[in-house]
Amino acid sequence: MATCLFLLGLFLLLPRPVPAPCYTATRSECKQKHKFVPGVWMAGEGMDVTTLRRSGSFPVNTQRFLRPDRTCTLCKNSLMRDATQRLPVAITHWRPHSSHCQRNVAAAKVHSTEGVAREAAANINNDWRVGLDVNPRPEANMRASVAGSHSKVANFAAEKTYQDQYNFNSDTVECRMYSFRLVQKPPLHLDFKKALRALPRNFNSSTEHAYHRLISSYGTHFITAVDLGGRISVLTALRTCQLTLNGLTADEVGDCLNVEAQVSIGAQASVSSEYKACEEKKKQHKMATSFHQTYRERHVEVLGGPLDSTHDLLFGNQATPEQFSTWTASLPSNPGLVDYSLEPLHTLLEEQNPKREALRQAISHYIMSRARWQNCSRPCRSGQHKSSHDSCQCECQDSKVTNQDCCPRQRGLAHLVVSNFRAEHLWGDYTTATDAYLKVFFGGQEFRTGVVWNNNNPRWTDKMDFENVLLSTGGPLRVQVWDADYGWDDDLLGSCDRSPHSGFHEVTCELNHGRVKFSYHAKCLPHLTGGTCLEYAPQGLLGDPPGNRSGAVW
């Protein structure tokens, strides 16, 4: 008896079972005009895996909700006050999530266009390649990117990379509201059936256009399982070398962007220690505005809610905790596609249908023709070398002048070379011709030529490499002409001072007796320009704008 009472007590302590949200409804219930569960059309919709864009066409019929016996499945939506809603026969395992939204901004650092595409494709939960011939076998020193390679965010990153040297900072907020998936053999949409019937029996060069027309309408894959809710994704492009010249790093700016995003959605107070640290950094670097206003080259995507897809809820002018709350409150009735699983379109055909294999080949061919290739054999610029960690990346030796990203550490730096020295009509001795030599000074360095004996019109073949100097503050470029005697009593015949500027210059200086001529070449370091190399100069990748394998590469 005591044992029974003990077991009864344990049973009463157990949590009450949560009722299943969906049930089989009677015919009379099914006749009532209930709405479908939110976002139900996204499962079964087509998608192009190279662009990650939904096609807007539906190979699967997600509108049918009545079974042959006229019953249906109805669900209680706890996120919409237990509203009763229909579930199509093509959908199963529908569940609302109780966690709603967490006010947290996830941050990530990305260093290449390929990395941006990879991040975009990370929302695919399964292996989309299964059953397709899409595993690139690139030639030596080539790297392929397929999924997401033509997505909007990857195109944004590619265009930036061809303008300048960039790092990318990603800030993301996600909310998950619902999840569901297609049944094992979902009913096909009538229009898709018609499109399949119109396809030629085989895929070859003469039928390629017909198959690609279907792919352009429906995509390469269809969505089989979804997590719906909302996502705000902001990718900020940061000019790597401009940051270095401003005394900042991409990590420092990225961290402060994340702090400002946290404040904008109410996840962090503006009195937090992190926020105060970023405010102090702004003062140190004399920034007049916020980090997100200073660094505003960005790509924004907002999924879910009634707002426009480019409305920036993290860094926009109206980005406030109240605006974020309004957006999250709209997600139960207007969810977006957060995560998903994909299957190739050809798997919807019966295995014995010969067009199944033809469509598989067509999809594989289309995807591979869209692959973007990174040319890792592309030569590095002068002074750079291939990274030991990544053969596709170039880097520099860390030094006082440049960092490992090959960025100059300060403005005004140039490589200075002085050469082509000659003099005319010198007069250094009374009884013989001049025994002339030169001294050349700049930035605390001194070079000296050899003596040209007994010649009033001497030439020197010396090439004086001052290497990397501060052009604007190194002082004048000074060339002195001397007449050699015994060393202690050498005579200074004249001096020539010039303030060097970038470019190639020929100089003629008049002396008391005769003249001296020379030339100098001052080449601004990469990412610097202007007369004294004080201005910033964007410097992108070598070659043409991004394209596919038949054109340019990343």
UniProtKB/Swiss-Prot annotation:
Belongs to the complement C6/C7/C8/C9 family. Keywords: Calcium, Cell membrane, Cytolysis, Disulfide bond, EGF-like domain, Endosome, Glycoprotein, Lysosome, Membrane, Metal-binding, Secreted, Signal, Transmembrane, Transmembrane beta strand. Changing residue 490 to N: Does not affect interaction with lipid membranes. Disulfide bonds join 22-75, 30-72, 101-175, 241-407, 376-392, 380-394, 396-406, 496-509, 524-533. Changing residue 191 to K/V: Loss of cytotoxicity. One of its GO terms (molecular function) is pore-forming activity. Detected in cytotoxic T-lymphocytes and natural killer cells. Residues 1-20 form the signal peptide. Ca(2+) 5 binds at residues 485, 488, 490. Ca(2+) 4 binds at residues 485, 489, 491. N-glycosylated. The glycosylation sites are facing the interior of the pore. Gene3D superfamilies: C2 domain (2.60.40.150). Changing residue 483 to N: Abolished binding of the weakest calcium-binding site, leading to impaired interaction with lipid membranes. The record marks 213, 343 as: Important for oligomerization. The chain crosses the membrane at residues 128-148, 256-278. Monomer, as soluble protein. Homooligomer; homooligomerizes to form a pore-forming ring. Ca(2+) 2 binds at residues 429, 432-433, 435, 454, 467. The keyword Calcium applies. This is Perforin-1. Residues 395-513 form the C2 domain. GO terms for biological process: defense response to tumor cell; defense response to virus; granzyme-mediated programmed cell death signaling pathway; immune response to tumor cell; immunological synapse formation; killing of cells of another organism; positive regulation of killing of cells of another organism; protein homooligomerization. One of its GO terms (cellular component) is immunological synapse. It is a multi-pass membrane protein. PANTHER family: PERFORIN-1.
